[in-house]
Amino acid sequence: MAAKDVVFGDSARSKMVEGVNILANAVKVTLGPKGRNVVLERSFGGPTVTKDGVSVAKEIELKDKLQNMGAQMVKEVASKTSDNAGDGTTTATVLAQSIVREGMKYVASGMNPMDLKRGIDKAVAAAVEELKKISKPCTTNKEIAQVGSISANSDSSIGDRIAEAMDKVGKEGVITVEDGKSLADELDVVEGMQFDRGYLSPYFINNPDKQVAVLDNPFVLLHDKKVSNIRDLLPVLEQVAKAGRPLLIIAEDVEGEALATLVVNNIRGILKTVAVKAPGFGDRRKAMLEDIAILTGGQVIAEETGLTLEKATLAELGQAKRIEVGKENTTIIDGAGEAASIEARVKQVRTQIEEATSDYDREKLQERVAKLAGGVAVIKVGAATEVEMKEKKARVEDALHATRAAVEEGIVAGGGVALIRARTAIAGLTGANADQNAGIKIVLRAMEEPLRQIVTNGGEEASVVVAAVAAGKGNYGYNAATGEYVDMVEAGVVDPTKVTRTALQNAASVAGLLLTTDAAVAELPKEDAPMPGGMPGGMGGMGMDM
């Protein structure tokens, strides 16, 4: 095991604080509408230009081990805030730096770090309650667009696109972000349920222009096993042919004789069919087949439920108004399932979301809810160059997370104003002793830091603006984009409550840990062994007799 370097007390803390400051100073230049860009080097290709706090934080690794520990702890603040609320990473970093800076002064003067932390925690809890009180619900399209615009660095076109997407697919709908092919942003909305499986044979195509198979008013056969023997399918195919309607077969796989027969029938015009593989794998495949069954009002033909293909009747088949099958996707529009059954299924999946432990599972379950309840919208980001597209795509994703957070917990005045107003809840707060009171003061000072940084990035005098905003009431604040004092909510400068709350809680959590640190253990840098003496050996035997 390698030898370790153990550093105690102020020596450990001061080095870690240096790391905190290096990271925070790089991140905080991006805050606000007049925030600056940060250029990130890439080992391959051109550099990346960004105004996203968490992207900057993730790139920073420091040479000094102790400094790097401090930087990594604040990086955790940015990452956690981004994971929980989707935005507010720069605000969280600025708050953490301020709490650490002010707290270190008190620790150096001999105050008890544990009591300081208790005071900080008490103040943050009171501020969070106040934020919840002053929060207002975010319901209208205009408010959703405003939240998206602010989060995308005051780009109103992004806010409008997100509001339009949410309007089309509902609050529960899935909205994804992809690279576009043109200069302008585009919005594609897929109504109904779409899953990523296409036709098993190109001979099923009946619309050559679009290269898709379109089925109007079809039956839907759902089976959880492979279908390779046509005899299994014959009874149900005869019933569908009598009804004179097309058929979509969704099974684990359709192959061999069964697939060949379906293709021949399709080409000859005897029976219009399309076969696709079932989406997902394992247990998720079963669940998705069940979702499709409920959406189309059919049943999954599985041995577990006592149903077999040979005995299947039209009653077990699902139905839909229209189905489009492409090379890679299948879209079921207007399934014939009962609204009550669909609602019950959505409720069931929502319960699973609450119980899910991994982010991946939660995301997949959320997608299932969206496919059952609303639809899927795809925002295609357009830009002139790849560098610009990457930067813009990151901003759109940020804005999307922020709007979801706003719909969830409501909105407060942006531009650092909400934190200034929440200070009123802490102003009269007292701790159990003088050290806890100092902790409360630390948070009071830190809560004006985001506004100070926004104003500083805008090139104005921070102290003057902070005093003017603090003297005002309600949503009165400073709009750094225009340089005017306005009602922030009316001006459309708003933040999701969840973002502001999460930023404050995460910043206080990590800053408290730093303040109460009294020793740091790091690996000693390895010393490379010197090269052995003497000339390196040459290559013998290269002479040639002429």
Swiss-Prot record:
Its EC number is 5.6.1.7. The keyword Electron transport does not apply. It is found in: Cytoplasm. GO terms for molecular function: ATP binding; ATP-dependent protein folding chaperone; isomerase activity; unfolded protein binding. It is an enzyme of class 5 (isomerase). Keywords: ATP-binding, Chaperone, Cytoplasm, Isomerase, Nucleotide-binding. Residues 534-546 have a biased composition (Gly residues). Gene3D superfamilies: GroEL, GroEL-like equatorial domain, TCP-1-like chaperonin intermediate domain. PROSITE patterns: CHAPERONINS_CPN60. Pfam families: Cpn60_TCP1. InterPro entries: Chaperonin_Cpn60_CS, Cpn60/GroEL, Cpn60/GroEL/TCP-1, GroEL-like_apical_dom_sf, GROEL-like_equatorial_sf, TCP-1-like_intermed_sf. GO terms for cellular component: cytoplasm. Residues 526-546 are annotated as: Disordered. It catalyses: ATP + H2O + a folded polypeptide = ADP + phosphate + an unfolded polypeptide. ATP binds at residues 30-33, 51, 87-91, 415, 479-481, 495. One of its GO terms (biological process) is protein refolding. Its main location: cytoplasm. Together with its co-chaperonin GroES, plays an essential role in assisting protein folding. The GroEL-GroES system forms a nano-cage that allows encapsulation of the non-native substrate proteins and provides a physical environment optimized to promote and accelerate protein folding. Forms a cylinder of 14 subunits composed of two heptameric rings stacked back-to-back. Interacts with the co-chaperonin GroES. Belongs to the chaperonin (HSP60) family. This is Chaperonin GroEL 1. It comes from Burkholderia vietnamiensis (strain G4 / LMG 22486).
